[in-house]
Amino acid sequence: MARVAVLHNTLDFQGGADVVCLSVCAALQAEHAVTLYTVSETDPGGLAARFGIDLDTTALDVRMPTGADPLARLLSAVAPAVGPQLALRSVLLRRTVGGELGAFDLVVSTANEVSLPTPSVQYVHYPQFRTHRLPDGDGGGLNRVWSRLAAPRPDDLGDGTALLANSAWTAGVTETVYGVRPSVLHPPVDPIEGRRAWDERRDGIVVVGRLAPDKRIRDAIRIVDGVRARGHDLSLHVVGAAPRAYRRYVRRVESMADERPYVTVERDAPRARLEELLCTHKYGLNCKPEEHFGMSVAEYVASGMVAFAPDSGGQREVLDGRENRLFGSVEEAVDLIAAAAAADDPPALPPDRFGSERFRRGIRDAVARAL
C-alpha cells in the first residue's frame, strides 16, 4: 500500500473536474492510503453523494492548508467580479503544502498540470498555466506570474510524470502549450438506471450543470423560445449546482425563467431528482462552446436522451462528431432541435461509452506504472 496525495485546487465549483477528483480518490482507496489536499468550502462527502460517487469518507484524509476556510470563502465572494482564479488557487495550494509532499510515494493532481517535487500523475482538464502560448489567448499578465510560480517545465512532464487529459481536444491544446501530448482518459459517466422508453418520455429539454455564465444558460432559454416559435411545445428544465460565486448570474437566469411558464430552474437538486429528469425527458442541451469534455453532454447520452451541444471542444467526441447534434449558433441550435422534435427519432449513441469502471481502471493503471 502506497501513500498517495491528491491535489485539487477547489471543489467549490461543483463541476466535472470535481467528479474526476472524487472518483480518483474512490478508485485508489482500496489499495492505497489517500490524502486529499484542497482549498474548499464544499464538503467532499456531500458532493460525492450528489454526484453518485461511492467514496469512503471515513477512510479519506482531507487536509486543508492553514487559513484555507476564510480563503475559500473570500475567493467565492469575489469570483463574480474577478472570475474563479483557478490557477491562483493551484499556486496557493502547491506552495502551502509543498513541504509535505515529500512524505508521499506519489502525488496525483486532479486539477491540471503543476510543478511537483515527486513522481506524479497529472490529469489535465485544460492547461491552467502558460496560456499565452495558445493562438487565441494569453490569460493576462497574472497568468504569467502564476506560471512562473507553479507551472511545470516540459522536461518535468517526461519520465516520472504520467500526463492524462479528459479528451483528445484537450490533449491537443496541452501539446500546443508544453510540447507533450497526454494520454486520453475520458471522465467517468455511468449509464443511468431507470431510463424510460422513448415514447414514454416528456417532450422537453433538460439543461444540467453548474449555473454559471460560461454555461450560457440564458442562451438555452432563447433556444427553447425559438423552438417553441416553430410550433413545438417543448418545456425547459434547468437543474444544477448554484455555487455562491455565481449568485448574481443565477438571479438573472431565474428572472428569465419567471417570465416563461415553460421554463423551470432547480438549484442544487439531489442526485435522485437529477436522474429522474434525465430519464424522463427526451432532449439534453449544453450551450458552452469549447467544453473541455462535456460531463453534462455525456450524462444526457448515459440517460438515453438525444443530446445537443456546440460544435467545438471535447463534446464533439462525446457526440461522435454527429453534424445533426452539433451547432455553431443559437439559430442553428433552434434548427437542429426543431428538426429532431419533428422527426421524434430516439437516440443512436450507446449509454455506456464512458463507464466509471473504465475510468477507475485507467487511474489505477497510471498510478501503478508511476509507482
What are these regions, as identified by a protein language model?
Residues 235-251:
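Glycosyltransferase donor-sugar binding loop
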Residues 306-309:
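Short hydrophobic beta-strand element within catalytic cores of glycosyltransferases
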Residues 164, 189, 195-215, 221-226, ...:
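Conserved donor-binding/catalytic core segment of Leloir-type glycosyltransferases
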Residues 35-109:
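Active-site donor-binding segments of glycosyltransferases and PAPS-dependent sulfotransferases
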Residues 341-371:
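A charged, aromatic-enriched C-terminal amphipathic alpha-helix characteristic of glycosyltransferases
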Residues 289:
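Aromatic "clamp/platform" in nucleotide-sugar-dependent glycosyltransferases that forms part
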Residues 139-163, 169-175:
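Membrane-proximal helix-turn-helix segments that form the acceptor-binding/catalytic region
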Residues 250-272:
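Nucleotide-activated donor-binding/catalytic signature segment of Leloir-type glycosyltransferases, i.e.
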